[in-house]
Regions:
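Central regulatory/effector-binding core of bacterial HTH transcription factors
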Residues: 35-96, 164
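A late-sequence structural motif
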Residues: 50-52, 121, 126, 197-238
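Hydrophobic hinge/microswitch elements
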Residues: 75-78, 83-87, 93, 140-198
Length: 239
């Protein structure tokens, strides 16, 4: 058979990109969401997924009923997720760094220490906090939360008894135990609503949240419209 040369493969890739650019240009004019019939994939972990995307879906149903929203886990987002079109948008506190990757900050959260008040007193001092056993979220491959790495860099060493792959795994371990979880405060509005929380007795940085997309979608009218809808949801949900 005929084997494509590297030059031919490069030309084919350029042709695909050109066709994509022409298609996006055709969509960059007037856009009617009511006529949008497509699947839009957003990569988000359970914190931002549960906080934002149900409200986004409810909003989309009003004006873009033909749109299917597909949600996949972002874990630690990679450039390939966006460059390879595995998703059209990422929502994450860790935007991948690339010249062809764009981002916009959606909101900023702060950290609180969650615990079961039936099992322990609040950790009000640094000594209480460091003496306790902790639970945290670790994304594969063993990528700790930015907070955990920040505290370790400050010489604040905690004893981790449990590590789970997502925020949804925290409540079953915290309930009925003396474990502490230092996680985003807005989890208190849904996932951790039945637990108590206090301000961390150690210095914690803020946690920004971004929406991230590939530059190929910057002038796409449909993509731009959906980004605007997400920002509107943030304005309603994040107060």
């Amino acid at each position: 058979g005929i084997v494509a040369t590297a030059r031919a493969e490069a030309l084919a890739a350029q042709a695909r990109e050109l066709l994509g650019a022409l298609e996006r240009f055709a969509r960059s004019g007037e856009f009617d969401p009511a006529r949008w019939n497509a699947t839009f994939t957003i990569a988000a972990n359970d914190f931002q997924r549960d906080l934002l995307l149900p409200a986004l879906m409810a909003r989309l149903r009003l004006s873009a009923s033909g749109l299917v929203l597909r949600v996949i886990p972002s874990d630690v987002p990679s450039l390939e997720m966006l460059r390879g079109e595995h998703c059209q948008l990422v929502i994450s506190p860790r935007p991948p760094d690339g010249a062809d990757i764009l981002q916009k900050r959606l909101f900023e959260d702060r950290y609180r220490v969650f615990y079961d008040p039936a099992m322990r007193e609040p950790p009000l001092t640094r000594a209480d906090y460091l003496a306790a056993q902790h639970i945290t979220v670790v994304y594969e491959p063993r990528r700790a939360l930015d907070l955990d790495r920040h505290l370790a860099a400050q010489g604040i060493q905690r004893r981790f008894a449990v590590m789970v792959p997502g925020f949804a795994g925290l409540p079953p371990f915290i309930r009925g135990s003396e474990l502490l979880a230092t996680v985003p405060a807005r989890l208190q509005s849904h996932l951790l609503r039945d637990l108590a929380s206090v301000e961390p007795p150690v210095p914690c940085p803020p946690m920004p949240m971004y929406m991230v997309w590939h530059a190929r979608h910057q002038v796409d009218a449909a993509h731009r419209w959906l980004r605007g809808e997400l920002e509107a949801v943030v304005g309603d949900v994040v107060t």
